[in-house]
Amino acid sequence: MPKLGVSLFIFLVLFPLATLQLDGDQSAGRHAQERGEDLFKMYQYLRRALERRRTGEDFLEECMGGCAFDFCCKRSLRDTTSD
């Protein structure tokens, strides 16, 4: 009889706990996906900023108008004005 109790406890309590995903586990995947999209957008802005930096004055004019990510423009402005 004790063997039956142990096996029932394992299959009815421990097995479902090990196989079910909690809400916290599911939301972590969603946030990781959102961060990945943000990284891709930041990469696009950085790439565009570096391409504009090669053209010179066009980059300075556009960056003064505003940028979605100010840190790339401020850093690039600092680099171009120090020359």
Swiss-Prot record:
On modification after translation, the UniProt record reads:
Authors of PubMed:25600641 studied the activity of this peptide with the C-terminal Arg residue, which is probably cleaved in the native peptide.
Where does the signal sequence lie? 1-20
Keywords associated with the record: Cleavage on pair of basic residues, Disulfide bond, Ion channel impairing toxin, Neurotoxin, Secreted, Signal, Toxin, Voltage-gated sodium channel impairing toxin
Q: Name one GO cellular component term.
A: extracellular region
Compartment(s): Secreted
Tissue-wise expression = Expressed by the venom duct.
Propeptide ranges are: 21-54, 76-83
Molecular function (GO) terms for this protein are: sodium channel regulator activity; toxin activity
Key word Repressor present: no
Q: Does the keyword Signal apply?
A: yes
Describe the function of this protein: This toxin inhibits both the TTX-sensitive and TTX-resistant sodium currents in adult rat dorsal root ganglion neurons. The inhibition on TTX-resistant sodium currents is stronger than on TTX-sensitive sodium currents. When intracranially injected into mice, the toxin induces tremors (50 nM), spasms (100 nM), and death (200 nM).
- Which family would the database say this protein is a member of? Belongs to the conotoxin M superfamily.
What is recorded about the domains? The cysteine framework is XVI (C-C-CC).
Q: What is this protein called?
A: Conotoxin Lt16a
Give the species this sequence originates from: Conus litteratus (Lettered cone)
